[in-house]
């Protein structure tokens, strides 16, 4: 009898110990589970490890019942940076610097398990820094993701270059622009505009790119329809996410390279010599026409700035305005707009966060007055 009782007691204590361990342990919440909400052009070939490429790509979720949050990522080069925003505290993000390969990042450790927390994991950097695979999160056992029915938000997509990416915007000196740590799409004019206006945001931008010529062998008309900029066979499904508003900010790189006759990219793109004004306008019209084909109902805002392509005496604003005027006249496209950002008069480097805030203010005002009214 005593022996039986003793065995039963030992068995009970062992089960209790295992139960406590289970309750105090952790669990993996895989990236393909319900409760994760993704934003951006993402490669879901492996649903348990979706690949993030573009700046501004993000995943949002709400969890409850956990004191900790760990994020599982696999980074290609160890050069990407993410903002982790807890409970919409936009001004105080957790800065996550990726290490190369598969890593687990302990982001929060002392949360109140009795509360719910909203989280956004936002890619600050771009495809130049390589891909990042999101492999899920780790929470305390017993925690779960909240299923949230989200109201529809108007959608906005930006097509642009390093200005839209946010290259060097956290480098006030202008001399360390190439440092990925100084690149923050979260504080680009594009992301600020979308966030402040409550728009669902997507950013299809790459530093150095142009409409006719780039600083490398790829131009926007060749890249705009790809899931990954360097993989032409991997095409984006434009029907999977349709924006209400499209903002195009291109021609800054063209404005330099059309005059650099010795540059190899210039030589390849302009075999017959420097392009004429008519050819430049036609190239812009062709690209906007490509966007119109895939987004027939979108309001398209053609912008430029705030670097020296919009400085006094430069013809590039005129090229864009002429292209839009011609498309309105001959294609009867009345859903085209133009907006030119004020020249920031910066002699070195890219627009800073201060410049981006001014650009965002200008764009927000324009959208409110002309499209979101």
Summary of predicted features, one role per range:
Residues 155-159, 164, 201-205, 244-249, ...:
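Structural recognition of the beta-strand scaffold that forms the well-ordered cores
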Residues 164, 198, 202, 251, ...:
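Sec-exported extracytoplasmic/periplasmic mature domains
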Residues 151, 241, 292-295:
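Short, conserved loop/helix-junction motifs that constitute active-site signature segments
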